[in-house]
Each structure stands twice: as structure tokens, then as C-alpha cells.
Amino acid sequence: MRADLEIIQDWIPAGSRVLDLGCGDGELLSWLRDHKQVTGYGLENDPDNIAQCVAKGINVIEQDLDKGLGNFASNSFDVVVMTQALQAVHYPDRILDEMLRVGRQCIITFPNFGHWRCRWYLATKGRMPVSDFLPYTWYNTSNIHFCTFEDFEEIGRAHV
């Protein structure tokens, strides 16, 4: 399991109702269901990931996050999770507002493009970083917003 998911699984109380935005192959929801009796849904737009979720018995909805979460009532989830997807939506501020509307608690992870390793890679190689954690080349990536922790704190203050 990815390191960020291992941390997140500890933060989610047993029996919670969870919405996982950009749930990928359903790894987090599957683990939470099996170990913490969590219920909920994953939202995903990649057909291969959706098929993997279905194979794992995960409740998954094919949905574009940029279209919002209007199909969910306010406060309908205990926790809304978005891991490694904020940088891939066109309007991060809108999805943050929607997350806060439908969930009592929100957990977000994203690649910190201001991390020293990213800056070092860029400075020494003259290229955007490519690694196990950032596996895409700049021209073939879903990452359209490159933010740092400072950037995220700023948008968070504006939308909380």
C-alpha cells in the first residue's frame, strides 16, 4: 500500500461512511472495508480502475470530479478522502468547497512540487521530475496544477 494511504487508514475511525475521490483501483476503500468495517463510495473516471474496484466489491461511481458532488447530500459522509488527485482537477477550489459540504472531515494528499527533491531534480537535470512517486513526463501527465504546501495552506484558508 502507498505510504500516504497507510497513514490515512489510521485516521479514519472504524464504522465511518467514507467518500474517496479519485479512488483509483479501490485499494484504500477495500482495506478500510475489510479492516475497519467502513462503508462508502469511490469516485473514479478511469475505466480500468473502475473495473478493478468492481472486482474488489467496491461501490464505485464513474464521475468527473470537475462536475462537482451535486449527487451527494450535505454532510452525507463522515470522511471525504482525496489522495493524489487535487492536482489533476481543473478547479481545486470548487472541489474543496464540495468536499467540505458533503463530509464532516476531509483528508487530502497531493504531490508537493516544492519539496527539495523536486527542486533539486529540476535544478540539476533541467527537467520536470520523474520518479516512482511522480511517474509521468511533463507532456503525458494528469497533473495540471503544481502546488506546494504553502499554496495548499493558502487555498485551505480561503475555503474553510
Predicted segments, located by residue:
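Class I SAM-dependent methyltransferase SAM/SAH-binding core
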Residues: W31-G68
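Short conserved loop adjoining the S-adenosyl-L-methionine
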Residues: G68-S74
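Glycine-rich SAM-binding Motif I of class I
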Residues: G26-S30
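Conserved alpha-helix/loop element of class I SAM-dependent methyltransferases that forms part
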Residues: M1-G15
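A short SAM/SAH-binding and catalytic strip from SAM-dependent methyltransferases
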Residues: V79-Y91
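S-adenosyl-L-methionine-dependent methyltransferase catalytic module, highlighting the catalytic core
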Residues: D93-R101, Q105-H159
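Class I SAM-dependent methyltransferase "Motif I" SAM/SAH-binding loop
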Residues: G22-G24
